Amino acid sequence: MESEPADWESASGGVASPARRESVLSSYRRLWRTLVGLYRSHPEVLWFLLAAAIYRDGLAGVFTYGGIIAKSTFGFTQDDVLVFAIVANVVAGVVTIVSGYLDDLLGPRRVIMGSLAVLVVMSLLIFALHDGGPVTFWALGLLLSSCVGPAQSASRTFLARLIPKGREGEIFGLYATTGRAASFLAPAMYGVAIWGGAFVVGKDQAGYWGILGIVLVLVLGMVLMLRVSDPKGHITDLD
């Protein structure tokens, strides 16, 4: 009896079936059509998705690499880093709650831009005062952490006001997808900044230069946000 290699390979998971390959390709084509439709009809939605994907990766980088910089540059012990992380998360949570009132008063776009601006300034101060010791990092680091939550919360509020009625699920799905797609930026720029700093201060002393990479990511997100204005209510049609 002759075997049926195509069916056997498909059943065993060795080779994807044509139908499965077509399904994957169809998904990418559908995604591309959605992005093109956004760009043509309401480009501000697409610009915000791009801007948010970038600066949200910078926000993630603040928490990811903050402890490393605290330990390698500011003399924190491992226990100090753990205590700081707990306090920073509590502070971030409290400030996020308070920022909800600012969101209603000023609008989410201003909260986003203000939070990112403070993050950039505090990051540059941490870089400039890298020899200030633990007290310096506690003061600047907590101010830095306090702006992460408001930026994240206001981003979701802003998107909810910007997207069209009836397309909330689809656009929030794109919001999550674009965020994952940009997740390489902060690690890459952090590494590049340290690599560049090694030529200036030496490899062993260049750890704090990584924060400049995070700053570049945040600034790029802010620049893209300049293309997005405050929404005047829901967009009613994307087609």
Model-derived segments and spans:
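Hydrophobic core of transmembrane alpha-helices in multi-pass small-molecule transporters
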Residues: V135-P150
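Intracellular juxtamembrane helix-capping segments at the cytosolic ends
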Residues: P150-P164
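Multi-pass alpha-helical transporter architecture, strongest
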Residues: M1, L212-D239
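A membrane-interface helix-boundary motif in multi-pass transporters
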Residues: V192-L218
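C-terminal ends and interior cores of transmembrane alpha-helices
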Residues: A117-D131
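Helix-to-loop junctions at the C-terminal end of transmembrane segments
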Residues: V95-P108, I194
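Short amphipathic helix-loop junctions that connect adjacent transmembrane helices
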Residues: T64-V81
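Juxtamembrane intracellular "pre-TM" segments in multi-pass secondary transporters
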Residues: S3-L50
